[in-house]
Amino acid sequence: MLRILKILLFFHVYNGLWSQTIPPIQKYDLQEYEVGTQNWMITQDDEGSMFFANNEGLLELSGSRWRIYPNRNESIIRSVKSIGDRIYSGSYMDFGFWVKDAKGNYQYTSLVETLNIEILENEEFWNILNYNNRIIFQSLNRLIILEPINEEVKFIHPKNPILKSFKVMDRLFFQESQSGLFSINNGQAELVNDQKVLKKEILVGLFENKGKLLGLSNQSCFYEIENNSITRWPSQIETLKEKLTFYSAAKLGDDRFALGTISNGFILMDSNGKLIHHMDYSSGISNNTILSVFDSAQISAQFIFQK
């Protein structure tokens, strides 16, 4: 039976009729959850509750109930990740975790304070990854690797800014500006590929596809990456008339790709590069910039964040 794709969009309500070729869409208006106008990242706990890195704090969607937990320093939460019974978050010059108390409310503990971690000036944490029983907090300047059991902390300091970090095929990768793609091996950064394209374009997504490493650049090109070679991987998004700039991407549980653009909406593509849907303002999306995409396995839905 064909799986129905549900897309939940934030901030705008649209009352028009959908074409039969467009998947059903449910939208949440800003007034429904009454918090910041931008969500930067999403995660889901084992009970199915959704958590969003919101401009005003940690935003929770449990069933139909929205709830906001303000960040302790009142800064924007940039990253969020559910691991076990904790919801980890990263923000401006701080990162830590949230745990539910006896009343069902989430309380925050700063790992920066608890572990006496020296934070760099104006450092923000844009991604959180769970890898080999370690938790990785990524800022533009470095990777902070935490072993939560013994609270041991290690640091990786590239010489140039970190553009993105990924967990793919049981490996941890990061892209360093002007240097290329690196992986982490035994706590050390090792160069994977320093081809010219990886020094100039930003990888917004890195995936396993049919046993190979597949990267999506912000300049609307897919690349197969192997050892120190890189090959352009053809897809139908290159045939679109618009020049696309990608900002977000996710591989879904059925091997399709959900791709978010700046100013050109949302694209759904299969594992062979075939375009399935391109939804933008003309399809009813009120804002064409997609900050993040997430595949929710428990509720068979895709969440898209709009700017």
PLM feature segments, named:
Residues M1-K307:
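Carboxylate-rich, polar loop motifs that coordinate divalent cations or form catalytic acidic clusters
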